[in-house]
Regions:
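Interdomain boundary/hinge elements
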Residues: 5-7, 13, 17, 35-46, ...
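Short amphipathic alpha-helix segments
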Residues: 52-66
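Pre-Walker A segment
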Residues: 130-174, 180-186
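Divalent metal-dependent catalytic cores for phosphoryl transfer on phosphate-bearing substrates
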Residues: 156, 167-171, 176-226
């Protein structure tokens, strides 16, 4: 009987280790390295006459808008539309919102463009922080520093494979918490690591590193155990 009990215990330990290995491998496979992101957005115009006003005399208006927002504005033969192109989703959103307000207002000149971009930038930065705070509150995660909150909030404006990255990160955090409970490891730590797993996708600066490496570096600078 003692031998049978020993064999059963060893079998159980082996099964638990195998289950943990399977779960870890599965999670890794569900975190692809390549980010497929939408880098362009279209702004509708009331008429094609608006294209000339957006360009401005000697191109001053469009140059001002591109310089202030860091995007490329493409004006071609597409009827009643212009295209905004930028890899940074926050810059793209600021440019889109600014251009839509300028078109609606009708006053389009360098001084007005600067005024609108400044206002929209302030609003978007506030939105970033609010979305980061909301995500952490929903998950019950505490003591994240300001940089961490903002890094998460930037993901609100990012999509990857057709999904909002902040929503995806929250879902991963909830799944990680449940899995951690099942395999007997720290749920809070798992949840915290999971919510941060994609922050590299929202990095403000372009990098040759993949998003996981960028995110790990960001987490270390934020004081997280990466």
């Amino acid at each position: 009987q003692a031998m049978i009990n020993k064999i059963e215990q060893e079998a159980q330990l082996t099964a638990e280790k195998k289950a943990k290995d399977v779960l870890v491998t599965t999670i890794q496979r569900l975190a692809p390295e390549v980010t497929s992101d939408i880098t362009v957005t279209t702004v509708s115009l009331p008429s094609d006459e608006m294209k000339g006003r957006i360009i401005g005399r000697e191109g001053r208006n469009i140059r001002t808008l591109e310089t202030l927002t860091g995007v490329d504005i493409i004006i071609d033969d597409t009827p009643e539309a212009v295209v905004i192109s930028c890899f940074d989703p926050v810059r793209k959103e600021i440019a889109k919102e600014s251009l839509e307000r300028l078109i609606s207002d009708g006053r389009i000149h360098p001084a007005r463009i600067e005024e609108v971009v400044q206002k929209v930038t302030h609003e978007i930065q506030n939105k970033i922080y609010e979305e980061g705070e909301r995500a952490l509150f929903d998950l019950g995660i505490h003591n994240m520093n300001t940089d961490g909150v903002r890094a998460l909030g930037r993901l609100y404006f990012r999509t990857s494979y057709g999904q909002n990255v902040l929503t995806h990160s929250k879902e991963v955090a909830m799944a990680a918490s449940l899995i951690a409970a099942e395999i007997g490891v720290d749920r809070e730590l798992a949840k915290r690591a999971a919510i941060l797993h994609d922050i590299g996708k929202g990095a403000e600066n372009d990098s040759d590193q993949n998003h996981a490496e960028v995110g790990a570096e960001m987490a270390r600078k934020m004081g997280e155990d990466a």
